[in-house]
């Protein structure tokens, strides 16, 4: 469907001199507009049941190419002033999105109907699906993929991944609850219905240790579906002695048999997770 656009973007990626040609610049802008409308994504689910996703590298390339073709300009809202290449997103009433002052989403970020932006920030290339709340001072980085009915609590940091273009963005799947001041970065993948307790840090290399069985099972950059996760530590020997290393602990599971909200409350009550 977008084969011609993809061809132009790939050629411009290999030869940046082509960006001086207006048809190429128009193609780049068209891709970013489609991302802004949610018709194209920098990453998308291939098999949601298995939490399998694919990265649309050519779309990420278009987002990156958008920066050099945009001129710096002054923007104002009353007495407030900015000087940047990127416009902010507009038309929230028509989009059916609730946006509380002083929330900001950049043009090129898709915000689905019934999403709520408290005073927060959403960067270009991101996808925020329907019913999701981005709470106060939470940030959604470039190209991050946030599913349906997700709650990003106050101060949550969702990292952005533009380059390398083949790298997967941060993915937070449907019905996840990310506790306050938690950080998910470096292309980490939090699968559906997972709960992250307050101050949990998940990076691409974080040891995520399932301690619910007779033996620990360690994941990296991946939180399995319905996991209840809290900050933790493990001991590691160094030349200077033994020290604690930060990790994340899977201490339980949300039950499929219960309603999503009830399941969340049960998880917090049963495992003492602070959010």
Residue ranges and their predicted role:
Residues 1-97, 220, 226-227, 231-275:
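Terminal amphipathic alpha-helical/low-complexity segments used for targeting or macromolecular assembly
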Residues 97-237, 250:
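Structural signal for interior beta-strand "rungs" in well-ordered beta-sheet cores
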